[in-house]
């Protein structure tokens, strides 16, 4: 079996300028076997999310905040990337995987909430709380998500990952 790496752009459902996949691996017959994408760079988070009210615990995404001596680091950006954009690599039979579809739906829903609150001139922010499930040492792109809208107009997103 021969693997051929094809580079192309697939545009997202909700944002036509969004590049979803970086590589597709095919066999010699041209059947797609695996789809890969790269992690978002910090430049992406700073430019794309600079005006969005996304917070990781109490730190604003896209800025280096010194709160309690902690910055948002590479691992935190990695978790946000997987949660909001789906797995980095998946087999074709997993293309409709819950995490991939869930990531697209989450991004659209969060964007709609932000736009709606901007129109209503309300202060609004989305706060992500990530917790590692006990006894799981590896990140397997699996999430258990609970969301709660507070009286202060904040969407709190609790994410357990493993």
From Swiss-Prot:
Q: Where does the record say this protein resides? A: Plastid
- Predominantly, its location class is plastid
Q: Name one Pfam family in it.
A: DUF613
* Record keyword Plastid present: yes
Q: Which GO terms describe its cellular component?
A: plastid
Keywords tagged on the record: Plastid
Among InterPro entries, the record links this protein to: DUF613 (IPR006851)
Q: Which family does it belong to?
A: Belongs to the A.longa ORF167/ORF288 family.
Q: What is this protein called?
A: Uncharacterized protein in rps2-rps9 intergenic region
Q: Which organism is it from?
A: Euglena longa
What broad taxonomic lineage does this protein's source fall under?
Eukaryota, Discoba, Euglenozoa, Euglenida, Spirocuta
């Amino acid at each position: 079996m021969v693997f051929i790496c094809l580079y192309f752009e697939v545009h997202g459902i909700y944002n036509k300028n969004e590049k979803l996949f970086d590589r597709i691996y095919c066999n010699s017959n041209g059947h797609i076997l695996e789809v890969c994408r790269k992690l978002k760079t910090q430049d992406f988070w700073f430019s794309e999310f600079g005006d969005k009210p996304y917070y990781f615990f109490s730190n604003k995404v896209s800025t280096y905040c010194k709160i309690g001596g902690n910055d948002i680091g590479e691992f935190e950006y990695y978790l946000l990337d997987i949660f909001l954009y789906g797995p980095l690599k998946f087999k074709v039979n997993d293309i409709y995987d819950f995490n991939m579809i869930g990531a697209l739906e989450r991004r659209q829903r969060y964007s709609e909430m932000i736009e709606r609150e901007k129109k209503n001139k309300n202060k609004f922010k989305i706060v992500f709380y990530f917790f590692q499930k006990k006894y799981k040492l590896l990140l397997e792109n699996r999430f258990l998500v609970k969301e709660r809208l507070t009286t202060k107009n904040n969407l709190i997103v609790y994410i357990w990952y493993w």
